[in-house]
Amino acid sequence: MEIVTKIAPICLALIMLGLGLGLSVKDFTRILRVPKDFFVGFFSQLVILPIVALGVALILNLPAPIAVGLMIIAAAPGGVTSNVLTKFANGDVALSISLTAVVSLISIVSVPFVVITSADILGVTISSDISMTGIALKMALVVTVPVIIGMIIRGLAENFISSKINIINKITGWLFIIVFAAIWIEEKDNIFNYLAEAGLAVLILNIVMMMLAYLIAKKFVSGIAQQKCIALECGLQNGTLAVFVATLIFDDIAYVVPTAAYALIMYITGFIFIYILRKSN
């Protein structure tokens, strides 16, 4: 897992820099204008998603590393991908960006809490050298700091950055591919065995969570565009961040595998979900 451990933080920092380049202060202040829509998405992603993931892990009686890996991907925020697919689905892109931005920044606290708490529940021992504070500080260096730097750069050269945002999104997409290609290459002898163990769990989590988030949003938020956005935000996670956290805490590739499986499945289910919504509308 040596290659993945080395490239994951670099790629994640660059991806978060790209996210920051696409953000402005209005993406944070916007939530004050539509607090209900934001809160429903925020609560669904930050609270309900990890609870559903824990339920899936316990019901399927997953091996401990796979179960904790599932919790890591469930704790991860949405990424640029969720913003892109929300646009493709004619969802509320502004709300999607706000959710991604806020949940990403909060993730330096929420992710360590979810992972360490769930590991304790699932009977997984974490090294005494690993603390919630230590994880949060390391995450801040590769998540929060790059986002802030990106926002500062955008503020200094907004017109130029705005004209290049599509290129920036494509670059971040390739960085995502590089990380997961490294996982497959480095663990090519074992990857299919791991995927066989994790595949059903991540498929169930992804489908159940998108459907549940959509139903919750349908009950509480203002319109169909917001409902699509919240469902996709809860179904499309920042896989690179999840890989970074998994390699930061654990030495076993098994903890990373649910992330790799989820990254494959979420695109397929995401597009199927969008297709169904378009047909129904």
Spans of model-derived segments:
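Alpha-helical transmembrane segments of multi-pass small-molecule/ion transporters
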Residues: 1-281
